[in-house]
Amino acid sequence: VVVGDGPPASARRASECADLFAWPLIAEPSSGVWGHSGNLRAGALLLGSTDWLAAHRPDRVVVVGRPTLSRPVAALLADPDVRVETVSAFPRWADAGRTSVQVTPGLAGAEPSAPVDVQWFEAWQRASARVNAAIDAVLDGPPGLTAARLARDVVAALPGGSLLVLGSSTPVRDVDRLAAPRHDVTVLANRGVAGIDGTISTAVGAALVHDGPSFALMGDLTFLHDLTGLLLGEGEPAPDLTIVVPDNDGGGIFAQLEPGADRFVTDYRRVFGTPHGRDLVPVAEALGWPAFRVSTPSELREALRGARGLGGPRVVVVRTDQRAEAVLARELRAAVDAALEGLS
């Protein structure tokens, strides 16, 4: 079962069916069931392991909502040997690859046609446990904070009952790939056209109506694109919101994609890296938000712990490096493949 951004009721029903029929569940952070006990952490990394997936490829995938975050998920849905069924209560549904062979308004039309295969399900769980250990070992290797580790550690450090707003591009994908799902944290993300506009405004608005502490994790370009969202009207309430910004001075996601290849190194920085050259701490302070920089896991924990009792808005900036993050992504992929080698 693959669950993307979409109606929470359909997502909950899908997760219940996954439990009932021992179906592996891969749910994106904004799906509404990311924290479900059956959701496989790092499911996208698991699907990205070619050899392991070849031995455990499903015959059928049930899709709920609009999954957009992962190339391995998209590749699975595009596989001609996999039957793709979509659940949608609306007359329009997400099917970018045009691969769905059946669309039903609810899971009543998607009952299993074969006995429950508990052993196959347990094989997915064992593989997920191996992957989790492998990625944690890689993330804990460098002494400082990377953007990848930041995504995992921010989610882990949030107090129960928190709201977490995720920016598009790398942060939401890092949380999807690397963070341990939390059932006691509400996760929101603007997945519409997957753009970065308006994320600060979204976080401020959501924080103002949330009964509890609120946090946002967004990249530096996302932060800069909605900078005036930090402006609060005179007499308006201030949100209890902490915005955490991994700042790699530009569009770091492209360093992990095809434009980041060595043959494009001459033009990469100007065309794709798009450096802004701004210190985001004084930028945030100029708009009235307390802001400070952290560089170690302990400083991050202290910053998030301190935010719980302060109330009001604040910005936490973590400097990262685009090229180093790309290298780390390759190390994570290699570690996952090694962990799954020979696993039945």
Regions found by a protein language model. Give the residues of each.
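Short beta-strand segments
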Residues: 2-4, 63-65, 87-88, 167, ...
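Glycine-rich, anion-gripping cofactor-binding loops and their flanking helix/strand elements
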Residues: 3-97, 181-212, 224-231, 295-297
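Phosphate- and divalent-cation-binding pockets in alpha/beta enzyme and binding domains
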Residues: 9-10, 71-72, 153, 174-175, ...
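Flexible, charged surface loops at secondary-structure boundaries
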Residues: 18-19, 53-58, 78, 155-160, ...
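Conserved acidic residues
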Residues: 59, 101, 162
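Terminal amphipathic helices with adjacent charged low-complexity linkers/tails
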Residues: 84-122
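Active-site diphosphate/adenylate-binding microenvironment
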Residues: 125-211
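Thiamine diphosphate
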Residues: 174, 179-344
